[in-house]
Amino acid sequence: VSHNNFLRF
């Protein structure tokens, strides 16, 4: 899981 993915909301 990319923890950076939530920043791309």
Swiss-Prot record:
The modification Phenylalanine amide is found at F9. Keywords: Amidation, Neuropeptide, Secreted. It comes from the Eukaryota. Belongs to the FARP (FMRFamide related peptide) family. It is found in: Secreted. It comes from Macrobrachium rosenbergii (Giant fresh water prawn). The lineage of its organism: Eukaryota, Metazoa, Ecdysozoa, Arthropoda, Crustacea. This is FMRFamide-like neuropeptide FLP8. One of its GO terms (biological process) is neuropeptide signaling pathway.
